Amino acid sequence: MAKTPRRILAVLCLLAAVFFLLPLGIGILHFGMVWPAALLLLCAARLTWPDFFRRLLRPKWLRALVGCVIAVCMTAILATLGKMAMAAADRPADGQDCTVVVLGCQVFPDGHPSLMLRGRINAAYDYLTAHPETLCIASGGQNGSEPISEAQCIRDTLVSMGIAPERILLEDQSASTEENLAFSAALLREKGLSTDVAIASDNFHQLRAAIWAQRSGLTPYSDGCASPWFLTAGYWARETAALLYMVVTGS
């Protein structure tokens, strides 16, 4: 490849790496930001110093091995992203009787929902408004930095938006997606509610949430919402890694 196109591609890789790391500006750092940024920086280095990498990968068997690993990893990543997108698009049919399960995430120290939790609450509100007979489970416990449980924050916010409090059940003991769905499933059965559930969570989260819902005996559908633009890439990458880890470990 000519030097100028290589430089342009290297700059694009650097810019993409910076994009993945943008959440650092608001104090967020997780694995889904790190591994794509590291790979993009490696690509930028490969484009900038091609002779060094040619010497590094001089043995044909090593080049073939690296090529196979890259092909397998890219296939797995793209297949996982495709399944995630399909799960996010799997919404309930018109007129279908579903119970909404809102999955909690960070609550700010002042008791207000984070941007991501606000998106999930808004998705639940839209569904509950369109289906006035539907009930909702607010699911999420409380960690050390949160003044109230995530479930309580979800409930309080929905009530402030006009949803009747008697339509909202609390599940405030869970500390993971697995527990969100397992504990919500137990509450659904205790109250005799429909086990067809519309999961109010970010689009990237729908596939893993659906897997845990199915393992808890529920029939999941998406009540998904878009994530804030500067968080989206990193969380899709983190979720991809989490799903592939589940496949590899059988968890």
Segments from the language model and where they lie:
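Short, Lys/Arg-rich, polar N-terminal cytosolic tail immediately upstream
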Residues: 1-2
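Membrane-embedded alpha-helical segments of integral membrane proteins
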Residues: 5-52
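Residue-level signal for protein termini and structural transition zones
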Residues: 12-16, 67, 89-92
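Helical transmembrane-bundle signal
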Residues: 16, 20, 43, 73, ...
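Membrane-interface helix-boundary motifs at transmembrane edges
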Residues: 51-63
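Internal/C-terminal transmembrane anchor helices
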Residues: 60-83
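A structural signal for short, hydrophobic/glycine-enriched beta-strand patches
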Residues: 79-238
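A transmembrane-helix-recognition feature enriched in membrane-embedded lipid enzymes
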Residues: 232-251
